[in-house]
């Protein structure tokens, strides 16, 4: 998971951004596919993000786009988010 968090082609850390947990996990599974890694389950992925939020400057929120769970301070490449995402990659 640490290697994924450093993969700037998939995820970027910016204080004024936010991303749904679903989109973060989608980017992670694509990274795993591209790097021949086996992904951890989504629950374990989310637990990792919560546990390491301070290390990456993330803040958990239940109100991403008004109704989704996710994190502030991060965005994913637009290919991993829906067309209407607020991603500013």
PLM feature spans:
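Short alpha-helical segments that sit at the start of domains
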Residues: 1-5
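Positively charged interface segments
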Residues: 10-89
